[in-house]
């Protein structure tokens, strides 16, 4: 399968320059003064108009073309490539807020398949994954299928989110379903064959080797579990292009926000701080700026629970 944008990056930049030239010529013809603020306004309008989401066309092996109108993560094609290679188990590893869940959801939509997910917190048990037996009005008990079993049986894309936070016994129960192509449901004893179009994705903040400096409470995953994802792991980073697109909604203020977030990430990494500056910071920052708040307001909110030493290390006043 092949994913392609209906408009190339070259065409996109040509569109930006064309819009800029047209707007500036219009001002010159009207003999209007072009001060710095007007030039900034023209640039902001041109860039915002040219960076609207471009439809993505996914060409399926049977010749059909699925079109995705939403803006996709820059690693979207990597996920589709692994599926195209025949990988039915995929692992996405990356910091919080990089868009892993949305990335998988978009992949399912592009493939024309159903999508479901579960976050594997410590309280999740086998019944959440494999279904449960519930009492009926006539006094009997009936099995109620879970979203995972439905997709395993009928095809689709299922996401196990936060797998490095899961109970170890739960992951062992999932192992057979990941590798053997068949599952003996521990709830009702039914043997279910895995559908050929069933893709199972595991998302984590670590590589399953235990907690690290930031994600302290993460569990180590069993070696048998990790082996299910050999050659099908993707390190998912922040999509700075997507963040820049978000920021165009507030013009030059948005660019200042993005520049600050990028510098902040570098300083967090350089000083090995247990802090996160995710895409959500950009998203919520754009909302605040759109509502009339300033970048200083955004910073004040973000740093309210930081220590003076932490602020100093990232270049902010205590």
Task: Please identify what each model-predicted range represents.
Residues 1-318:
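C-terminal regulatory/interaction module of P-loop NTP-utilizing enzymes
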């Amino acid at each position: 399968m092949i994913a392609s944008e209906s408009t190339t990056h070259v065409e996109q930049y040509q569109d930006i320059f064309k819009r800029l030239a047209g707007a500036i010529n219009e001002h010159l013809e009207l003999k209007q003064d072009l001060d710095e603020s007007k030039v900034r306004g023209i640039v902001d309008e041109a860039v915002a108009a040219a960076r609207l989401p471009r439809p993505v066309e996914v060409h399926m092996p049977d010749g059909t073309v699925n079109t995705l109108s939403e803006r996709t993560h820059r690693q979207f094609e990597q996920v589709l490539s692994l599926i195209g290679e025949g990988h039915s188990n995929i692992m996405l590893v990356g910091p919080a807020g990089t868009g892993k869940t949305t990335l998988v959801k978009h992949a399912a939509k592009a493939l024309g398949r159903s999508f479901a997910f579960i976050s594997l917190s410590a309280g999740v048990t086998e019944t959440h994954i494999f279904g449960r037996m519930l009492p009926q009005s006539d006094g009997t008990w009936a099995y109620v299928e879970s979203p995972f079993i439905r997709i395993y049986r009928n095809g689709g894309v299922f996401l196990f989110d936060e797998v490095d936070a899961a109970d170890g016994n739960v992951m062992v129960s999932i192992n057979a379903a990941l590798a053997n192509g068949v599952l003996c449901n521990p709830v009702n004893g039914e043997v279910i064959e895995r559908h050929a179009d069933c893709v199972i994705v595991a998302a984590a903040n670590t590589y399953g080797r235990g907690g690290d400096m930031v994600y302290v409470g993460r569990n180590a995953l069993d070696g048998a579990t990790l082996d299910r994802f050999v050659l099908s792991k993707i390190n998912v980073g922040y999509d700075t292009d997507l963040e820049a697109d978000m920021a165009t909604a507030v013009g030059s203020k948005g660019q200042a926000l993005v520049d600050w977030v990028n510098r902040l990430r570098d300083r967090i990494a350089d000083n090995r701080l247990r802090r996160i500056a995710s895409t959500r910071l950009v998203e919520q920052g754009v909302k605040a700026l759109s509502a009339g708040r300033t970048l200083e307001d955004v910073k004040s909110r973000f740093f309210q629970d930081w220590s003076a030493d932490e602020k100093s290390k990232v270049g902010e006043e205590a």
